[in-house]
Amino acid sequence: MISSRSISLATLLASLLLPMLASATSPSPPAVAHPEFYPSPDPVLKTMPFSEAVRAGDFLIVSGQIGSLPDKMALAPGGITGQSRQAIENVASVLRRHGATLRDVVECTVFLADMKDWPAFNTVYKEYFKPPFPARSATGASGIALGARVELQCTAYVPATAK
């Protein structure tokens, strides 16, 4: 005959051993990858205190891009239209360097020196981004670098296996 003391001891042992056995057969959680920071290849930008992009897991975060001409500290001509086009081209260049395209972009934040430029920016934006559009915010901002009329920061979804 089994005593109540034997049942209590068996219950205690089971409650202690079962969680250990379950964890021994369960796969361990994947290691958390640390962010990767990518400096700009541009000699001038390389000296600035920011990365051109950061990979965090499956996301590639592109630092704000203004409409500056490649390898120059000068803005593209053509006002908001020319600067918007160049800013998006600059985002596309950073994405390409890190294995992504504008089609991978899932979020953009737009900083406009004058919110009256929003319609003109949207016209250019729609030349590059097609439905379904990335999530997006736009805000008025004063003091954009180099006196730019627009700055664009984007995040792309690029699974590490596709990198």
How would you name each of these model-derived features?
Residues 9-89, 93-98, 103-106, 112-163:
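N-terminal presequence-like segments and the immediate start of the first folded domain
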Residues 1-4:
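N-terminal secretory signal peptides that target proteins for export/translocation
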